[in-house]
From Swiss-Prot:
Monomer. Forms homomultimers of about 100-150 subunits at optimal growth temperatures. Conformation changes to monomers at high temperatures or high ionic concentrations. Residues 28-137 form the sHSP domain. SUPFAM superfamilies: HSP20-like chaperones. Associates with aggregated proteins, together with IbpB, to stabilize and protect them from irreversible denaturation and extensive proteolysis during heat shock and oxidative stress. Aggregated proteins bound to the IbpAB complex are more efficiently refolded and reactivated by the ATP-dependent chaperone systems ClpB and DnaK/DnaJ/GrpE. Its activity is ATP-independent. Its main location: cytoplasm. It is found in: Cytoplasm. One of its GO terms (cellular component) is cytoplasm. InterPro entries: A-crystallin/Hsp20_dom (IPR002068), ACD_IbpA/B (IPR037913), HSP20-like_chaperone (IPR008978), HSP20_IbpA (IPR023728). This is Small heat shock protein IbpA. Gene3D superfamilies: 2.60.40.790. CDD domains: ACD_IbpA-B_like. Signal peptide: none annotated. Pfam families: HSP20. It comes from Salmonella typhimurium (strain LT2 / SGSC1412 / ATCC 700720).
Length: 137
């Protein structure tokens, strides 16, 4: 099991501590680490989650976002034929991976490329929370 220290990222993400805490907490869930995934900081307001879903067709994957919860499910079709393996090193099990998202993080899209599912996220700051210039009288 790997331990990831995201604390160096806290310095450049003032006010985003909650996002990193939620991502760290997500690692401790009892899902066995399958499938593996990466969370990438693309720029100040954009993130990308890459999930290794080799062996799954696009039609076997389901992505749902509700409130601040992103759920990715993979379920193989029941019609797969029974195989006799001499050695099976590639997992073919179904999965459900959940990501708790910080406030104002929106899912912008997803695509499947070469066995990796990429989910694009964007931080959208409401107008009320954006900095405003105060005039001095």
């Amino acid at each position: 099991m790997r331990n990831f220290d995201l604390s160096p990222l806290y310095r450049s993400a003032i006010g985003f501590d909650r996002l990193f805490n939620l991502l760290e907490n997500n690692q401790s869930q009892s899902n066995g680490g399958y499938p593996p995934y990466n969370v990438e900081l693309v720029d100040e307001n954009h993130y990308r989650i890459a999930i290794a879903v080799a062996g799954f067709a696009e039609s076997e994957l389901e992505i749902t976002a509700q409130d601040n919860l992103l759920v990715v499910k993979g379920a193989h079709a029941d019609e797969q034929k029974e195989r006799t393996y001499l050695y099976q090193g590639i997992a073919e099990r179904n999965f459900e991976r959940k990501f708790q998202l910080a406030e104002n993080i929106h899912v912008r899209g997803a695509n499947l490329v070469n066995g990796l599912l990429y989910i694009e996220l964007e931080r959208v700051i409401p107008e009320a929370n954006k900095p405003r210039r105060i005039e001095i009288n």
